Curated annotation (Swiss-Prot):
This is Anthranilate phosphoribosyltransferase. Its EC number is 2.4.2.18. Its cofactor is Mg(2+). GO terms for cellular component: cytosol. Mg(2+) 2 binds at residues 230-231. Pathway: Amino-acid biosynthesis; L-tryptophan biosynthesis; L-tryptophan from chorismate: step 2/5. It comes from Prochlorococcus marinus (strain MIT 9211). NCBIfam families: trpD. Mg(2+) 1 binds at residues 97, 231. Anthranilate 2 binds at residue 171. It catalyses: N-(5-phospho-beta-D-ribosyl)anthranilate + diphosphate = 5-phospho-alpha-D-ribose 1-diphosphate + anthranilate. One of its GO terms (molecular function) is magnesium ion binding. It holds the Pfam family Glycos_trans_3N. Binds 2 magnesium ions per monomer.
Length: 344
């Protein structure tokens, strides 16, 4: 099994010790090359869950998966930003980060959104985008062209990461969240320069921020929202890690300092696919409820900071709200459909 010792790796994990980058790399390559039996894969997934994965381990795993993805074209030479969450917050909100992607693109941010269907029976970014007319299995060259022409594109994860598709049956059998739930947001094939990434627990703030640093991102915002949201929330103070020029700083964002109105996370709830589609479209049209509009503006301000287009979060919120009310998010969706719509 290449040059690594499975018993040694498993022993370190079960004892709660951190793997080196080399050990993590060897483990992931053995898995990718189908050198691990299903029981061994299940064992390392369970071990990582019990010991809490480190930023170094996450980055090493992400690099292997990113290098293995299907990508027959050069990575676009643009300052790209991705926006997503790890999921798992149990809040059942509407697709906030997906709406944020289109609003951010309307403000000039180059967005490469990497996403998937929901694994939990809820509504993922891919589900809602397919519902409003984005073709998920569009040819890869169209995805690249769309980014160049419109400033936004959507990368449906299974098209680019066939190895993760093969993992799906085991993850379903295990029935619990694993390290792969954290890796999805870290393996965007376009290798963005910046990212806004929401996490469902505060314990993930530091390892995710460290992983993004090790992956070489220029800027990133990792946020754990008030009330346990994996987005910045209107419910109270949001815990944040800012990554800039290789340095990670901790902060809290009080939404009242940004001129926003406090609101319960219950006011952000989605529902089934049709309800989530309706909320998503009403946000992009600029006629959603105030909490729905303001939570999208808040998270868009974080994207504007990550992109370097606006350092002041309060200014970013104002820019986002003005663009929302003008229906610019919808215009950006319609532009993308020209390249990723059903006719393509």
């Amino acid at each position: 099994m290449s040059d690594f010792s499975w018993p040694k790796i498993l022993d370190k994990l079960l004892n709660g010790n951190e793997l080196t980058s080399e050990e993590t790399n060897a483990l992931m390559n053995a898995w990718l090359n189908q050198e691990l039996a299903p029981v061994q894969t299940g064992a390392f997934l369970a071990a990582f869950r019990s010991k809490n994965v480190s930023g170094l381990e996450l980055a090493a795993m992400a690099k292997v998966l990113r290098d293995a993805c299907v990508f027959p074209f050069p990575v676009p030479d643009l300052y790209l930003v991705d926006t997503c969450g790890t999921g798992g917050d149990g809040a059942d909100t509407f697709n906030i980060s997906t709406a944020v992607a289109f609003l951010s693109a309307s403000l000039g941010v180059k967005i490469a959104k990497h996403g998937n269907r929901s694994a939990s029976g809820k509504v993922g970014s891919a589900d809602v985008l397919e519902g409003v007319g984005i073709r998920l299995d569009t040819p890869i060259e169209n995805v690249v062209t769309a980014l160049d022409k419109t400033g936004i594109s959507f990368l449906f994860a299974p098209i680019w990461h066939s190895s993760l598709v093969n993992l799906a049956p085991l993850r379903k059998t295990l029935g619990v969240r694993t390290v792969f739930n954290l890796l999805g947001p870290l393996v965007n094939p376009f290798r963005p320069s910046a990212q806004v990434l929401g996490v469902a627990t505060s314990e993930l703030l530091d390892p995710i921020a460290q992983a993004l640093k090790y992956l070489g991102l220029k800027r990133a915002v990792v946020v754990h929202g008030a009330g346990g949201l994996d987005e910045a929330s209107l419910e109270g103070s949001n815990q944040v890690r800012f990554l800039k020029d290789g340095e990670i700083s901790s902060s809290e964002i009080d939404i009242t300092d940004l001129g926003l109105t406090p609101a319960s996370n219950n006011q952000l709830k989605g529902g089934d696919l049709s309800k989530n589609e309706a909320i998503f479209m009403s946000v992009l049209k600029g006629n959603a409820t105030k909490p729905q509009m303001e939570v999208v503006a808040l998270n868009t301000a974080l994207v504007l900071w990550a992109s370097g287009l606006e350092e002041d979060l309060s200014q970013g919120v104002e820019m986002a709200l003005n663009s929302l009310k003008s229906g610019n998010g919808l215009k950006k969706l319609l532009e993308l459909k020209e390249f990723l719509g059903p006719k393509n």
